[in-house]
């Protein structure tokens, strides 16, 4: 890919709850809230074959990992879920990047 200005984060983002967000962007910043153990990101770009990269922006001793990944089916949106080992001790901000 050659680009002088690749804008992957263009799109909309709507917070639905402490553990769920709707997004249409290929990249974004999400906060996993203190006291929770996962964050679901609904996104129409997610496919079974997508590579999803997660990068913490907050210093943490807890591990973030891809817990689940689902392609859109019928009326259901595609989604992926990021988990953390145990309940988050503090808010954990992380970037995501969806590559198809």
Per-range role (PLM):
Residues 1-100:
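Extracellular receptor-binding modules and their adjoining Ser/Thr/Gly/Asp/Asn-rich linkers
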